[in-house]
Amino acid sequence: MMTVQELRKILSKHHVDTSFYSLMEHRPMVGEVYTALDKADGGYRVRTIERMQTIEEKHFGDEAAACRYVLKELAYDYPELKAYLD
């Protein structure tokens, strides 16, 4: 079961540009397009944000599922992350 802390370590290990994601943080625009994970409605929410507009939003009941979804999204630009999805 992956946690946000473990996800953060994986992304750091693979030098994923921090402008591509936001994990449990509320900060000004990170990048033009980025993936944001935060708590919402008793679970977790993952949003794709483009120019400060949410263009996609998914809700997950558990932390591990939300983390896996973030990895899947970031794997488009960082294919080495796919190893954590198997």
Tell where the protein language model's regions lie, with residue ranges:
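Conserved aromatic
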Residues: 1, 60-61
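Negatively charged, low-complexity tracts enriched in Asp/Glu with abundant Ser/Thr
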Residues: 1-29, 84
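N-proximal short alpha-helices
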Residues: 10, 39-43, 83
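Short aromatic-glycine-(Arg/Gly/Cys) micro-motifs in beta-strand/loop hairpins
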Residues: 28-55, 73
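Short, intrinsically disordered/low-complexity patches at protein termini
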Residues: 42-43, 69-70, 79-81
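A short, charged, amphipathic alpha-helix used as a generic interaction element across diverse proteins
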Residues: 61-75
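Intrinsically disordered, low-complexity charged/polar segments
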Residues: 76-86
